[in-house]
């Protein structure tokens, strides 16, 4: 779910923090991709006659087709993706997960009614609401990525938190996910729509955290409190406080505790046993991989292994899989070229104008070769 209404709020109050780019702008970039979010998208979008793709045994293959072709698209544009898989959800998410189970149960009832009535549109709508990423989906995608030569990371907890940690450590340029809470976890750069269908023609949205908090006029800790007031996966919100009111209150009172001390509690009742402090700690000190020992390696694809798995087991077209493997191998060589800005360590907030100037100068010269991205120190909670 992420953070309720955060993208719209940033667009309204800090529009300069959002840039829109074409996928070609990310040549030479390493990006941490939220795997579970991608797989969910593929299960929803990659369909035939309203149903997920399946092999002859009735096994779902939509996630594999989506992962294979979207990854190739990124690699063809010089992007080096690393997929990050969710680990065990935090205990504080149990309430949100219970709500999702209830919504699925309700969708099952509505689907039955739609099937009895023969309502085609409703059948498709409620079928999509039942989509859930399973352990098998994850394991099959990991196997596919290994054969493609693409690295992946198993997060100990939330994938978005580990994506953010990889960005802060200088291992990758950005976190790619539709969940806005990657910003709350502290990723300096968030990309949305990177793995969206090409047919949708959606520009990639690039959010810069430093510019968000600078333009709103708050600190990162206050931004986390703001996100908690907007609504997250980890605790309830104060009913009656919308986005505009939340910003005004944070600017005026600085912390949620001070807000509680100063608002009319009859008008704005605070949830009983409200876990906002625990939620804040989870955002500021999340459980993530040790980035100091995390190595990301992009290697040659295993064409024969891909054919055995995708064609032998999953019954995809051999010609298409071999063609895809050759594209991976070809573009892997091309993407070893680096970006000019990889040679410079950026400190603090960089304006989009300066970054564009640097990139335009770099594109006019012969691209330099580099052995990787500069490694930075990762500090939890920043």
From Swiss-Prot:
Phosphorylated. Phosphorylation upon DNA damage induces relocalization to the nuclear plasma. Mg(2+) 1 binds at residues 34, 86, 158, 160. It comes from the Eukaryota. Changing residue 33 to I: In allele fen-1a'. One of its GO terms (cellular component) is mitochondrion. One of its GO terms (biological process) is base-excision repair. Residues 122-253 are annotated as: I-domain. It is found in: Nucleus, Nucleolus; Nucleus, Nucleoplasm; Mitochondrion. Mg(2+) 2 binds at residues 179, 181, 233. InterPro entries: 5-3_exonuclease_C_sf, Flap_endonuc, HhH2, PIN-like_dom_sf, XPG-I_dom, XPG/Rad2, XPG_CS, XPG_DNA_repair_N. Its cofactor is Mg(2+). The keyword Transit peptide does not apply. Keywords: DNA damage, DNA repair, DNA replication, Endonuclease, Exonuclease, Hydrolase, Magnesium, Metal-binding, Mitochondrion, Nuclease, Nucleus, Phosphoprotein. GO terms for molecular function: 5'-3' exonuclease activity; 5'-flap endonuclease activity; DNA binding; magnesium ion binding; manganese ion binding; RNA-DNA hybrid ribonuclease activity. Residues 1-104 are annotated as: N-domain. DNA binds at residues 47, 70, 158, 231, 233. Its EC number is 3.1.-.-. Residues 336-344 are annotated as: Interaction with PCNA. Binds 2 magnesium ions per subunit. They probably participate in the reaction catalyzed by the enzyme. May bind an additional third magnesium ion after substrate binding. Its main location: nucleus. The keyword DNA repair applies. Belongs to the XPG/RAD2 endonuclease family. FEN1 subfamily. Structure-specific nuclease with 5'-flap endonuclease and 5'-3' exonuclease activities involved in DNA replication and repair. During DNA replication, cleaves the 5'-overhanging flap structure that is generated by displacement synthesis when DNA polymerase encounters the 5'-end of a downstream Okazaki fragment. It enters the flap from the 5'-end and then tracks to cleave the flap base, leaving a nick for ligation. Also involved in the long patch base excision repair (LP-BER) pathway, by cleaving within the apurinic/apyrimidinic (AP) site-terminated flap. Interacts with PCNA. Three molecules of fen1 bind to one PCNA trimer with each molecule binding to one PCNA monomer. PCNA stimulates the nuclease activity without altering cleavage specificity. This is Flap endonuclease 1-A. The gene is fen1-a.
């Amino acid at each position: 779910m992420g953070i309720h209404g955060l993208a719209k709020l940033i667009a309204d109050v800090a529009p300069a923090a959002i840039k829109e780019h074409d996928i070609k702008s990310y040549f030479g970039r390493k990006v941490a991709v939220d795997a579970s979010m991608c797989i969910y998208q593929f299960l929803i979008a990659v369909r035939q006659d309203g149903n997920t793709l399946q092999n002859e045994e009735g096994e779902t293959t939509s996630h594999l087709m989506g992962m294979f072709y979207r990854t190739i698209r990124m690699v063809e544009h010089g992007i080096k993706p690393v997929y990050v898989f969710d680990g065990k959800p935090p205990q504080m998410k149990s309430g949100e997960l219970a709500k999702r189970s209830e919504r699925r149960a309700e969708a099952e009832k509505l689907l039955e009614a739609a099937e009895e009535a023969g309502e085609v549109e409703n059948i498709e709508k409620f079928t999509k609401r039942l989509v859930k990423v399973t352990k098998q989906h994850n394991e099959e995608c990991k196997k596919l990525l290994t054969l493609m030569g693409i690295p992946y990371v198993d997060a100990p907890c939330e994938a978005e938190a580990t994506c953010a940690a990889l960005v802060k450590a200088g291992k990758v340029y950005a976190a790619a996910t539709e969940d806005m809470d990657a910003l709350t976890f502290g990723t300096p750069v968030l990309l949305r729509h990177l793995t969206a269908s090409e047919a949708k023609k959606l520009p990639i949205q690039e959010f810069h955290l430093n510019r968000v908090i600078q333009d709103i006029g708050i600190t990162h800790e206050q931004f986390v409190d703001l996100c908690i007031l907007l609504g997250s996966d980890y605790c309830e919100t104060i009913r009656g406080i919308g986005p505009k009111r939340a910003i005004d209150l944070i600017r005026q009172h600085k912390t949620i505790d001070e807000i509680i001390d100063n608002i009319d509690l009859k008008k704005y009742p605070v949830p009983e046993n409200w876990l906002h402090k625990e939620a804040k700690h989870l955002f500021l000190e999340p459980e993530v991989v040790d980035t100091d020992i995390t190595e990301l390696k992009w290697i040659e694809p295993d064409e024969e292994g891909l054919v055995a798995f995708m064609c032998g087991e999953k019954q995809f077209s051999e010609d298409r899989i071999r063609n895809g493997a050759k594209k991976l191998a070809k573009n892997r060589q091309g993407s070893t070229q680096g970006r000019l800005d990889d040679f410079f360590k950026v400190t603090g907030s960089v304006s989009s104008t300066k970054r564009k100037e640097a990139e335009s100068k770099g594109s006019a010269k012969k691209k330099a070769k580099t052995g990787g991205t500069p490694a930075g120190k990762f500090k939890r909670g920043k």
